[in-house]
Amino acid sequence: MSDPAVEVTPAVPVASPAKAKKEKKPKSDKPKKPKAPRTHPPVSEMVVNAVKTLKERGGSSLQAIKKFLVAQYKVDVDKLAPFIKKYLKSAVEKGQLLQTKGKGASGSFKLPAAAKKEKVVKKPTKAAAEKKPKKAAAKPKKAGEKKVKKTIAKKPKAAAATKIKKPVAKTTKKPAAAKPAAKKAAPKPKAAPKPKAAKTETKPKRAAAPKAKKPAAEKKPKAAKKPAAKKA
């Protein structure tokens, strides 16, 4: 009898644990060095500030800009030299800087007139905007003061008008001036009795008060008796 054929499966190679660990480790797990913080502003800002402060008529050269950066920001200019040149070229192309001499980054550079005017105009607009609310706040105070002054000024005027009216009424009521006129007029006209009668008629009209009538009536008969005795 023949033996049955037995199938033999090939053995699968099992990965060793040491190799699996090596494959899992990524290369990016290495600790990265922390970047040192910047001790100076960006190159573009430093260069523009250098050109502003130097204010050279013919423009500031690359060497003058470097000296300013060293003195002002204490920067290693040798390391920043390529960045400075790159910014100068791009600033000239964009119109942020004017190149008065040379070509590329080897010439002299100056700020354009338009940039200067914009900066000069912007400053007064801010100052004017701050001053406007102050004026608006001061106006209502002035108006309030004027109103108070007007009301105070009107009151004394009314009081003065009332004071003036009172003495006028007193002068009309006093008939003291009529009494001495009657005494003087009685003895003078001795010869003519007619004018005496006319004066007696005018006297009661002038005297409005009842007090003036009594003394005038008593004096009239005395003056009339004296001329009658002389004629007889």
UniProtKB/Swiss-Prot annotation:
The keyword Nucleus applies. PROSITE patterns: H15. Gene3D superfamilies: Winged helix-like DNA-binding domain superfamily/Winged helix DNA-binding domain. Residues 1-44, 99-232 are annotated as: Disordered. Its main location: nucleus. Pfam families: Linker_histone. The keyword Nucleus applies. This is Histone H1B. The lineage of its organism: Eukaryota, Metazoa, Ecdysozoa, Arthropoda, Hexapoda.
